Amino acid sequence: MAVALWYCPPANSPCYDTVNSLILSLQTLFPDAVLFEPHVTITSQLRCDSADDAAAVLAAACAALRACRPQLDARGSPVVRFDAVAVGRRYFDKVHLACAHDRFLYGVAQVIRELFVQDPPDPAAAADWVHSSFRPHLSLVYSDLYHVDQALLRVLRQRIGDALGAALLPHPPAPGLQALWALQPPLDGWSIPGSFKVVRCEGPVRDWHVLAAADL
């Protein structure tokens, strides 16, 4: 993962407080769970070797999202919305909120991927990555627990549904997932304001650190 770009809800906002409280409440269910800041990863593998590189990533991300603001305001829904809760089989997506498809969010990811991951910049490769590999989500639990038993799934479904004030409706899980529940109603996340952060994600999660941040 090395260096990643996160998009975070505004600190002390209702979305931040709700999700952060949920992350805390789920810690007790997984013996190896660790704490982390609520975020959606826009992309990882950034070419970022200096403070100037980090500043350039932030400037591009902010510019890309600000350019969408009139259209976001006109439609009245945020760029980050959640339509499902999933239990995955991998450490970083063990329990997560899946983002609804949003062309503005995907557009920001494509811009950053093209400019700061592809070397040299390659619009076609960035577009292919967005359509084939980009699965934006907000993690609630990181854990190496491979199989989540039915009793724990029931507790997760109840606790997450209560925290979000939504029904979790079972759906057939996609490959790589153990369980999938549709959120009814879908949950609004955030748009602008928000905070982009360039984060060095090396070693244990407790050792990750923010290299630079910019608020929108």
From Swiss-Prot:
Tell me where it mainly resides.
Golgi
InterPro entries attached to this UniProt entry: Cyclic-nucl_3Pdiesterase (IPR012386), Cyclic_Pdiesterase (IPR009097)
For this chain's UniProt record, which GO biological process terms are given?
cyclic nucleotide metabolic process
What protein name applies here? 2',3'-cyclic-nucleotide 3'-phosphodiesterase
Q: In the record, what terms sit under GO molecular function? A: 2',3'-cyclic-nucleotide 3'-phosphodiesterase activity
Any idea which residues are catalytic in this one? H39 (proton donor/acceptor), H137 (proton donor/acceptor)
Q: Where does substrate bind?
A: T41, S139, Y142
Function according to Swiss-Prot or TrEMBL: Involved in the metabolism of ADP-ribose 1',2'-cyclic phosphate which is produced as a consequence of tRNA splicing.
- Could you say which EC number(s) this protein's record lists? 3.1.4.37
Q: Which organism is it from?
A: Eremothecium gossypii (strain ATCC 10895 / CBS 109.51 / FGSC 9923 / NRRL Y-1056) (Yeast)
Subcellular localization(s) per the UniProt record: Golgi apparatus
Q: Mind telling me which Pfam families this protein's record contains?
A: CPDase (PF07823)
